[in-house]
């Protein structure tokens, strides 16, 4: 195996420019699932994925999953891409998952470069929307197959593939498909590998064994039939924006403390054993400062910082739709405003209970305002938290592969973000799920100037190659 891997590493380095060009083509497709006008681009990205894998000999198909309501209209959901590479009954079979949609991005948001043009700086940082989340890892799998074909090395496992275009907008339709195909298309899977997380910091690789869940809500406050002149009507009517700000100010304190009654009662108790795990993780407050670009930490030490990032819930305010947000001054009273916020959930929180508690709190606060405006509460989407065991044989495979590529034992960590499909795969297939990151903790997924370091991209491809060879040799 060592000789084969060394040759694979050499060809990956040799084909670096080709692999970067492929990633550049992927980034150039603005596959923003949250923008109805860009939905055709999400479909275009699905076609790109199908084409690239098909060229390498994979059997690919697109599954239509119907329509959904978006911006008041019925919109086709992007197809889910399924694929199979190899069907040798003597080999292990791994199901890989990635997503090909991305978060919204524009120069007006503050990007230093065009977000849909992959730009490489003199430090080897590749900037572009989706570079790390999640087009880089997806292109990494394509490149791993190509490296094997280039050398005529037999791919050591069978690959099943599941790629979606709605991950950044709630993964609508995916859960039903996975459950329907658990004993059909996905029946031969021995394990599942997802590459949609990141290192904790910038220097040491990790394997992720836990994720927080998410419940995303919006509150709509509506009053007049149209926007009003504040000089004419200010002080004479109940203003929707004032009501909304009053409600949102009761959700969370500036120090992160959630103010909604009952939320913290659901959280699993921190045991001494779990508490001690955080002592050995390679992370500093300087890592946090570097990742966020400012010294704005709530807690003074890494231990409490990581605990509140991974194992405690958080509530974040995301924005207000319908309010004036342009440059200059506009003295308008908005007729309708929509406040958006989410709660990251942890063991043992249940989404249904969280929704009930939030709705009760929001309704109670609104009623106390004695406003004549109208309130509407909506749960936009929810996904459960997930915890696995780092002692599973599959995680040992990931550990050995990481050690081979990086020369260091990875930290086993949890992640503050959410990948609801992880729970669905584990529950439906009854197979272990490994989260195998490619990018670093400062990549800025979902933020402006999202990037993926060239070194992580190339070593990530090598990691995928090593992972499948280690997987082929293990006896569970």
UniProtKB/Swiss-Prot annotation:
Binding, Zn(2+) 2: 99, 133, 196
Positions of the catalytic residues: 101, 167
Record-level Gene Ontology MF annotations: metal ion binding; metallodipeptidase activity; peptidase activity
Record EC number: 3.4.13.-
CDD domains, sorted: M20_dipept_like_CNDP
Signal peptide per UniProt: none
Residue numbers binding Zn(2+) 1: 133, 168, 446
GO cellular component: cytosol; nucleus
Compartments reported by the entry: Cytoplasm
GO BP term, example: glutathione catabolic process
InterPro entries named in the record: ArgE/DapE_CS, CNDP/DUG1, Cyt/Met_Dipeptidase, Peptidase_M20, Peptidase_M20_dimer
Transmembrane segment boundaries: none
The protein's required cofactors: Zn(2+); Mn(2+)
Keyword terms of this UniProt record: Cytoplasm, Dipeptidase, Hydrolase, Manganese, Metal-binding, Metalloprotease, Protease, Zinc
Protein family according to the UniProt entry: Belongs to the peptidase M20A family.
Function summary: Catalytic component of the GSH degradosomal complex involved in the degradation of glutathione (GSH) and other peptides containing a gamma-glu-X bond. Has a Gly-Cys dipeptidase activity.
Complex and partners: Homodimer. Component of the GSH degradosomal complex.
Name of the protein in its database record: Cys-Gly metallodipeptidase dug1
Native species: Schizosaccharomyces pombe (strain 972 / ATCC 24843) (Fission yeast)
Origin organism lineage: Eukaryota, Fungi, Dikarya, Ascomycota, Taphrinomycotina
Gene name of the record: dug1
């Amino acid at each position: 195996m060592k000789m084969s891997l060394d040759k694979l590493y050499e060809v990956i380095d040799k084909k670096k420019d080709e692999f970067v060009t492929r990633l550049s083509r992927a980034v150039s497709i603005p596959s923003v699932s949250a923008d109805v006008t860009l939905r055709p681009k999400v479909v275009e990205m699905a076609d790109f994925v199908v084409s690239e894998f098909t060229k390498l000999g994979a059997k690919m198909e697109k599954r239509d999953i119907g329509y959904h309501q978006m911006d008041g209209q019925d919109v086709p959901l992007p197809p889910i891409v399924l694929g199979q590479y190899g069907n040798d009954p003597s080999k292990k079979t791994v199901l890989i998952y990635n997503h090909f949609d991305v978060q919204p991005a524009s120069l007006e948001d503050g990007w230093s470069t065009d977000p849909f043009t992959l730009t490489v700086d003199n430090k080897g940082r590749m900037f572009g929307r989706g570079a790390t989340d999640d087009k880089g890892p997806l292109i990494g799998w394509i490149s791993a197959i190509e490296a094997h074909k280039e050398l005529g090395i037999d791919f050591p496992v069978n690959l099943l593939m599941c790629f979606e275009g709605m991950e950044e907008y709630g993964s609508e339709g995916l859960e039903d498909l996975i459950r329907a195909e658990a004993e059909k298309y996905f029946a031969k899977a021995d394990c599942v590998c997802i590459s949609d997380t990141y290192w904790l910091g910038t220097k040491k690789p990790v394997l992720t064994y836990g994720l927080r869940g998410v419940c995303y809500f919006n509150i709509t406050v509506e009053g007049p039939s149209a926007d009003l002149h504040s000089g004419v009507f200010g002080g004479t009517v109940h203003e929707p924006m004032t009501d909304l700000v009053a409600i949102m100010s009761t959700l969370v304190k500036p120090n992160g403390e959630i103010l909604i009654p009952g939320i913290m009662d659901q959280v699993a108790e921190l045991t001494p054993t779990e508490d001690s795990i955080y002592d050995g993780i390679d992370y500093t407050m300087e890592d946090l400062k570097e990742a966020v670009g400012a010294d704005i930490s709530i807690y003074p030490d890494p231990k409490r910082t990581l605990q509140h990032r991974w194992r405690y819930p958080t509530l974040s305010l995301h924005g207000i739709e319908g309010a004036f947000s342009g440059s200059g001054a506009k003295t308008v009273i908005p007729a309708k405003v929509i406040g958006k916020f989410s709660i990251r959930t942890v063991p043992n929180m249940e989404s249904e209970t969280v929704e009930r508690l939030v709705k009760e709190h929001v309704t109670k606060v609104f009623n106390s305002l004695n406003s004549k405006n109208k309130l509407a509460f909506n749960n936009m989407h929810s996904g459960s938290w997930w915890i696995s065991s780092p002692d599973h044989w599959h995680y040992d495979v990931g550990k050995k592969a990481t050690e081979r590529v990086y020369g260091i034992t990875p930290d086993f960590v949890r992640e503050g973000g959410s990948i609801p499909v992880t729970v669905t795969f584990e529950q439906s297939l009854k197979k272990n799920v490994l989260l195998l990151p490619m990018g670093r903790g400062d990549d800025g997924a979902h933020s402006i100037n999202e990037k993926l370091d060239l070194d992580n991209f190339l070593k990530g491809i090598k990691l995928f190659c090593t992972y499948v060879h280690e997987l082929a040799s293990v006896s569970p």
